[in-house]
Amino acid sequence: MKRIVLLRLGHRPERDKRITTHVGLTARMLGAEGMLLASDDSGIVQSLEDVVRRWGGNFYIKNNVSFKQEIRNWKEGGGKVCHLSMYGVNLPDLADELKKCDKLMIVVGAEKVPPEIYQLADWNVAVGSQPHSEVAAVAITMDRIAEGEPLEKEFPGAELTIVPAERGKHVIENAGE
């Protein structure tokens, strides 16, 4: 089974709460096992843990991690690191190689990332060579890697489950109990 974890860099608690939460939600929905937050924001942790509690799955969040240490540990454990940016090799040119990776850390920044990230990453991946959202970069990359498979995924232990419907909202409560 493929393991994917997201490393979020440069999160500014006063500015980036919503976008970082959405980066985590997107990674979770598209198959990541967890998110490493390289800053201190217990509000993000609480928000994402609440989603996991209500909507199921086993997604974890680690707060205030050292990005260098996490990358080092990941690589020592046999993992590869993919840094998403506007700069680097175009995603379509690397998608097949990323799909083959069994243990992948996806790094996405908020503010300008430390220059050493470009050296620490196994791949610097351009998700379009124009300014864009980190949420879009994560979504496009993870969808290309998984080829849409997580869109059919069920999340065990969910208190709430959405039932697909052509019209209206259909939610089953306490489906995980």
From Swiss-Prot:
The keyword Transferase applies. GO terms for cellular component: cytoplasm. GO terms for molecular function: tRNA (cytidine(56)-2'-O)-methyltransferase activity. It catalyses: cytidine(56) in tRNA + S-adenosyl-L-methionine = 2'-O-methylcytidine(56) in tRNA + S-adenosyl-L-homocysteine + H(+). It holds the Pfam family Trm56. The keyword Ubl conjugation does not apply. Keywords: Cytoplasm, Methyltransferase, S-adenosyl-L-methionine, Transferase, tRNA processing. It comes from the Archaea. It is found in: Cytoplasm. One of its GO terms (biological process) is tRNA nucleoside ribose methylation. Homodimer. This is tRNA (cytidine(56)-2'-O)-methyltransferase. It comes from Methanosarcina mazei (strain ATCC BAA-159 / DSM 3647 / Goe1 / Go1 / JCM 11833 / OCM 88) (Methanosarcina frisia).
